[in-house]
A protein has these predicted regions:
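P-loop NTPase nucleotide-binding core
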Residues: 1-72
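Structural recognition of the conserved hydrophobic beta-strand(s) that form the central parallel beta-sheet
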Residues: 75-77, 106-107, 121-129
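Amphipathic alpha-helical segments of the small helical/lid subdomains adjacent to P-loop NTPase cores
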Residues: 133-139, 147-216
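Conserved P-loop NTPase "ATPase switch" module shared by AAA+ and STAND
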Residues: 68-98
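Extended alpha-helical interface modules used as scaffolds for assembling large macromolecular complexes
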Residues: 144-145, 204-386
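Substrate-engagement module of ASCE P-loop NTPases
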Residues: 59-68, 94-122
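Conserved nucleotide-binding/hydrolysis micro-motifs of P-loop NTPases
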Residues: 8-12, 80-81, 129-136, 218-219, ...
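Conserved beta-strand scaffold positions in the cores of enzyme catalytic domains, especially
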Residues: 2-5, 124, 146-148, 156
Length: 386
């Protein structure tokens, strides 16, 4: 028997009472659905309390235990979705209230812990973005196992090269009508979607979500390459960077390290599967925080980098936004029209230096290097050329 919760559907509120009400409105139905789907086992069972997700779960689990029914599997998708929203909205006091004491959320997880201990729950599997909320929720929850950094688990987080190549050949055969395009398309997807390493010595993986996004659009276009190389839903909200770094100068310094130096140095002992909110916002911990947000990946035991051209382009967008660099199309389109007519690169280079680099103050040019030129020029080109 399975109970599936999806916390990403949680409606936000600015008060504790409002959040608790929204939590109950969302999470009463999953246990009701489990009971109805297994009515042959639950017989004439009825809930004595409604409108309280924790009490309804406890009642159903008590019945399972008393009648010796099959154990329950609990799945919680995006367990930290709404608590992360509290953090990005600077509602730290409300976050603390939700994740400490006898809050509705801690009480809910205590009910799950009790169910596991008493034998009515076989296991509870949670997915989320950060281990921060789990650390705050499960202090003393000593039966939890964190899979995040286990090698066998990280290998499942994307496609390896063999799997991606097989996937590409299948899509080309079915939708591309020309198997000679393999090398061309392979180079394209490696440059844009490969390069993710979740452990220092791991093999690189393709991001399965955006690779599948590309293939889906490739199929819909009957073998055409989509203009948009990345699903917009995967662009991490720039508010995370603002919230993580607290002040603008910290954000700029961090972005400078990635788009100018091309790397962030990290301490390997910091790469852990569980840490609290205070650690997450610590200045020296930024590289690992970015790793968990999906913004960087591991190059080796000492350095984190942006994994591919897609990530570099997204980061340059962040950089431009935080530095108030205009992307007014009227300043760029004439040069790209000229390029399309005559196929000469010089107008694009001149346009880049005048309209993009020309927006920076003179002192910035002391820091600008080849890596920055390459990343920023590619980002500008990708706006107008597919």
């Amino acid at each position: 028997m399975i109970i599936r919760y999806d916390f990403s559907k949680m409606v936000m509120d600015s008060t504790m009472n409002g959040l608790e009400q929204n939590f109950n409105d969302l999470n009463c139905s999953p246990v009701e659905i489990m009971v109805e789907h297994n009515r042959d086992l639950f017989g004439d069972f009825k809930f004595s309390v409604r409108g309280n997700a924790t009490k309804m779960l406890e009642e159903a689990l008590a019945y399972v235990r008393m009648r010796g029914l099959p154990k329950v599997y609990i799945l919680i998708d995006e367990y930290d979705n709404f608590t992360n929203q509290l953090l990005t909205a600077y509602k730290d006091p409300l976050y603390e209230s939700v994740t400490t004491g006898e809050s509705f959320l801690r009480t809910f997880f205590k009910a799950i812990k009790a169910g596991i201990g008493e034998g009515s729950i076989r296991t509870c599997f949670c997915t989320g973005v950060l281990p921060v909320t789990m650390d705050d929720l499960t202090s003393g929850y000593n039966i939890a196992e964190i899979l995040t950094l286990k090698p066998d688990f990280t290998e499942m987080l994307g496609f390896n090269h063999e799997e991606a190549a097989e996937y590409l050949r299948y899509v080309i055969r079915k939708y591309g009508n020309n198997e000679d395009r393999f090398d061309e398309l392979w180079t394209l997807i490696v440059n844009n979607y490969d390069g993710y390493r979740f452990l220092p010595n791991a093999h690189p993986l393709f991001n399965s979500t955006i690779l599948t996004y590309f293939f889906k659009n490739f199929a819909e276009l009957s073998g055409g390459v989509p203009d948009e190389m990345v699903d917009e839903n995967l662009r991490t909200d720039v508010n995370w960077i603002r919230r993580l770094t607290i002040i603008l100068e910290n954000a700029k310094e961090m972005l400078d390290a990635l788009v100018i130096d091309g790397e962030l140095i990290y301490s390997q002992p910091d790469l852990r599967s569980k840490f609290n909110k205070q650690k997450f916002f610590d200045l020296d911990f930024y590289p690992v925080s970015l790793y968990y947000l999906g913004m960087t990946t591991l190059k080796d035991n000492y350095v984190m980098v942006l994994p591919n051209l897609t990530a570099q382009s997204i980061y340059m967008n962040y950089y431009n936004e935080l530095n108030q660099i205009s992307d007014d199309a009227r300043c760029f389109v004439p040069a790209y029209r000229l390029f399309m007519d005559h196929r000469k690169l010089k107008p694009l280079v001149e346009n880049y230096f005048k309209e993009y680099l020309g927006q920076f103050p003179a002192q910035v040019f002391d820091k600008i290097n080849e890596n920055f030129i390459r990343c920023s020029f590619y980002e500008v080109l990708s706006r107008y050329l597919s």
